[in-house]
Curated annotation (Swiss-Prot):
Polar residues: bias regions: 175-185, 396-410
Ranges of Basic residues composition bias in the record: 147-167
DNA-binding region: 51-75, 103-126
Gene Ontology process terms (BP): pollen sperm cell differentiation; pollen tube growth; positive regulation of DNA-templated transcription; regulation of gene expression; regulation of pollen tube growth
Localization per record: Nucleus
Function: Transcription activator. Binds to 5'-CAACTGTC-3' and/or 5'-TAACAAA-3' motif in target gene promoter to promote their expression. Together with MYB97 and MYB101, functions as a male factor that controls pollen tube-synergid interaction in fertilization. Required for pollen tube growth arrest and sperm cell release in the female gametophyte, probably via the regulation of pollen tube-specific gene expression.
Organism: Arabidopsis thaliana
Expressed in which tissues: Expressed in pollen grains and pollen tube. Mostly expressed in mature pollen grains, and, to a lower extent, in inflorescences and siliques.
The HTH myb-type domain, residue ranges: 23-75, 76-130
Record keywords: Activator, DNA-binding, Nucleus, Repeat, Transcription, Transcription regulation
Protein name: Transcription factor MYB120
Gene Ontology CC entries for this record: nucleus; pollen tube
Induction: Accumulates in pollen tube 4 hours after pollen germination.
Length: 523
């Protein structure tokens, strides 16, 4: 087939779509025997070289390149046919170990073999050895091109090594010279960090571990770690389980709830207490009361004092703040004085719930336990309240964290208390509820007539270490009472001329009291 126009060379140098200088159309495709004879006769007479003159001198419709390739690969007299011998194969392996893929230079070392034959042999051998998993070179032959790589490849490898080393140095500088302020202010999905108590154990604290590996640590989990990085840089901190806290506090841990230190020290098991905020409507604080079932001991009321939510009160201090829903005339500073009266023999405290008196220690329980000191001559269940300004009744809802009853029973009293606990609790609850109504009526009655309101004070006494057999030695006894402007104690029983029987509460007398003061209020 003869085609006009330029084209590439075909097999054995046969040109395609090509015209000679004289305008002769050149052939392409396989050579014929007549063409081989014309080419062989011309080379025997004129020798090898000047292949473009073959077409001019012989009229052969082949280009010079096609004539050269046909003579070198098929027509020359010293050409070897067939497969390679063992010596030739070993020589090819040695030459390839020294020269690499230099097929023409290898063919010059093998007389009678062409570069195309050597290339085909090596590629076939390479595929077979890779498929079988055998080494490419025998043990006695070491590739020279691997020991002495090409200068261009060596420079490229050195450039890649220096670039990788420079990236590592930048990562180290970002990690070790990053300001601490940026690490502390880095946002995260965990709560605000707060230090964990030093004596907290792994089973008694509920903490989350703050990890921002992608922000604080330059080596993120998605970045491949080289051996140099693994040896020179510390690994990123792992995520700790929410049920345990890390032993080494190198990174800030975040407690989910600010528990008191006493609870953390005492609770060594895995039980966790989650304090909940109290509901909006709660019964009066003096409703939670218990009494001793003893003939010589009056009703013992344990008054619950509420504080601001999640603001613990120091257990070792004898002064505290009270935030309860009853107004006081003015906010005064805390004073300590002793009132000599027949109703109380313990020192009294006048407390001020100022903002500066809020404690900040987190190592003490978050509620104050006020224990009533029984007396044979008087009975006081009036708690002491103090506020800076008056509030509406709808806003006077106490926020109570919790309460705790501190009772020092003897063996006989404990048995009597267990027998009469159900009935006495119901009666004392009703008594306390009516007492609160009675106090509110008294406050309204005194305020309407222009009488000065009574200043409520807290009377506290130091604990008696001789008679105290309980473990709660740190608590102190508190008795509540009313003090007017002249510091005279006004007892509730003195106003109504009513005495309480310690063995049986007179419920009807409390109803009469309530009705009397309700009538006074209406007047």
């Amino acid at each position: 087939m003869i085609m006009y126009g330029g084209g590439g060379a075909g097999k054995d140098g046969g040109s395609t779509n090509h015209l000679s200088d004289g305008g002769v159309i050149l052939k392409k495709g396989p050579w014929t025997a007549a063409e081989d004879e014309i080419l062989a006769a011309y080379v025997r007479e004129n020798g090898e070289g000047n292949w473009n003159a073959v077409q001019k001198n012989t009229g052969l419709a082949r280009c010079g390149k096609s004539c050269r390739l046909r003579w070198a690969n098929h027509l020359r007299p010293n050409l070897k046919k067939g497969s390679f011998t063992g010596d030739e194969e070993r020589l090819i392996i040695q030459l390839h170990a020294q020269l690499g893929n230099k097929w023409a230079r290898m063919a010059a070392q093998l007389p009678g073999r062409t570069d195309n034959e050597i290339k085909n042999y090596w590629n076939t051998r390479l595929k077979r050895l890779l498929r079988q998993g055998l080494p490419l070179y025998p043990p006695d032959i070491i590739p020279n091109h691997q020991l002495h790589p090409h200068p261009h490849h060596q420079q490229q490898q050195q450039h890649n090594h220096h670039h990788h080393h420079h990236q590592q140095q930048q990562q180290h500088q970002q990690m070790y010279f990053q300001p601490q302020s940026s690490q502390r202010n880095t946002p995260s999905s965990s709560p605000l960090p707060s230090p964990t108590p030093a004596n907290a154990k792994s089973s008694s604290s509920f903490t989350f571990h703050t990890t921002t590996a992608n922000l604080l640590h330059p080596l993120s989990p998605h970045t491949p770690n080289t051996p140099s990085q693994l040896s020179s840089t510390p690994p990123p901190p792992p995520l700790s389980s929410p049920l345990c806290s890390p032993r080494n506090n190198q990174y800030p841990t975040l407690p989910l709830f600010a528990l008191p230190r006493s609870q953390i020290n005492n609770n060594n098991n895995g039980n966790f207490t989650f304090p909940r905020p109290p509901p909006l409507l709660q019964p009066p604080s003096s409703l939670f009361a218990k009494r001793y079932n003893n003939a010589n001991t009056p009703l013992n009321c344990i008054n619950r004092v509420s504080t601001a939510p999640f603001s613990p009160v120091s257990r070792d201090s004898y002064t505290s703040f009270l935030t309860l829903p009853y107004p006081s005339p003015t906010a005064q500073t805390a004073t300590y004085h002793n009132t000599n009266n027949p109703y109380s023999s313990s020192p009294s405290f006048s407390l001020n719930p100022s903002s500066s008196s809020y404690p900040t220690s987190t190592s003490s329980p978050s509620f104050l336990h006020s224990h009533y000191t029984p007396s044979s001559t008087s009975f006081h269940t009036n708690p002491v309240y103090s506020m800076k300004q008056e509030q509406l009744p709808s806003n006077q809802i106490p926020q109570i964290d919790g309460f705790n009853n501190v009772n020092n029973f003897t063996d006989n009293e404990r048995q009597n208390h267990n027998l009469n606990s159900s009935g006495a609790h119901r009666r004392s609850s009703s008594c306390s509820l009516l007492e609160d109504v009675f106090e509110e009526a008294e406050a309204l009655a005194s305020g309407g007539r222009g009488r000065p309101p009574k200043r409520r004070q807290l009377t506290a006494s130091l604990p008696n270490h001789n008679n105290n057999t309980n473990n709660n030695d740190n608590f102190f006894s508190v008795s509540f009472g009313h003090y007017d402007s002249s510091d005279n104690l006004c007892s509730l029983q003195g106003k109504t001329k009513t005495t309480y029987n310690t063995s049986n509460l007179n419920y009807s007398s409390l109803q009469v009291k309530c009705k009397m003061f309700m009538i006074k209020t209406q007047i």
